From Swiss-Prot:
The gene is rps19. The keyword RNA-binding applies. Protein S19 forms a complex with S13 that binds strongly to the 16S ribosomal RNA. This is Small ribosomal subunit protein uS19c. It comes from Chara vulgaris (Common stonewort). One of its GO terms (molecular function) is structural constituent of ribosome.
Amino acid sequence: MTRSLKKGPFIANHLLKKVHILNLEAQKKVILTWSRGSTIIPSMIGHTIAIHNGREHIPIFITDQMVGHKLGEFSATRTFRGHAKNDKKSRR
């Protein structure tokens, strides 16, 4: 179920403050965040946000095509190691 339009998008307060301060100072710094559920808004365009995936922070450069998506969509939490080539035990 999607979020109601009258509520607006969810953005963590600390992340919104950091982006706002960097926009006022016209600086480009990497912003560390653990808030994977925050929605990308137009004021974040051009910034690099390092999103935590459970083990490390992955830096993501925000572009205009990412607006409306969640930050967590751009940092995978699981590493796929590939399927087993000749695993005869699992066939039985």
